[in-house]
Amino acid sequence: MTVCRPVTWAFAAALMVAAVGHARAESPEAGGRERQWYLVRASKDFDAGRFERALVNFEAAARLSEAPLPEEAVRRWGIAASEAGWPLAAYVRLSQYLSAMPGAAGREQIQVRIDRARRVLLDIAARQSRVIVLTETRHSWEASGERQVIRLVAKDGRATVEALSGVRVTAPAWERAGQIEEGAYVGLIARLLDSPALLDEYPPQILDPNEPGPRHAVVLRLVLGPEERVRQALRGEPFDKLQALAQLILDFSRTVQTAP
């Protein structure tokens, strides 16, 4: 089985820059007013039981600012996703809400929704899901360059792993590919869902070409059915947490038993 090698640093960097958010011509004040407008619309839709529309408006509001949404908006966002049948969005937002508000009223009901969403996601994981990890350290005086690409895929109960690492992905120092046991793969997905690195929100990080020292990048993309969550980081605590999660996935890819 041939390992796919579609990923380069340029792609990873472009993905990160694109995810930083689109540049807007309007002032921050105008962006704040637009965000508030979406929050008002989302709340009205939520109160009227139009959960799909509420979900869209909450997502639009979140994209308009680096600042996190108010906790109550996050709670409603998660419930709207739960009611509209989007388990990954429900799981992420409601988990974030309970993390921020551990003593919140109605915690038990929120936890029931989280647990239900998690069960659905693990069921989806075996049928249609992907985990993609890209990590890179650019060559510098302080460190040699290295790339790692990991791709785990499950479809209709069949799971596969493709992984490689080296200075160049076109000529990797190490690579592995094969079919793996479904239960092991779903167990990995469960660990990812429990990881704060997947659930945490933090301000976007922009690549600075003048930054001293070795430049690092890590991208994690988790796809479960029609939903996905992408996390990426370049420095600081967000990078450390996400890099640790990427290392967990790499260790899994190195050690998991493949079919002969």
Language-model features, listed with the residues they occupy:
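Bacterial N-terminal signal peptides
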Residues: 9-18
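Short solvent-exposed coil/turn linkers within tandem alpha-helical repeat scaffolds
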Residues: 29, 61-69, 98-117, 146
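Alpha-helical segment of the N-proximal tetratricopeptide repeat
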Residues: 31-60, 64
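Short, charge-rich amphipathic alpha-helical segments embedded
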Residues: 58-82
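Short, well-ordered, aromatic-rich surface patches in folded extracellular/luminal domains
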Residues: 112-148, 197-260
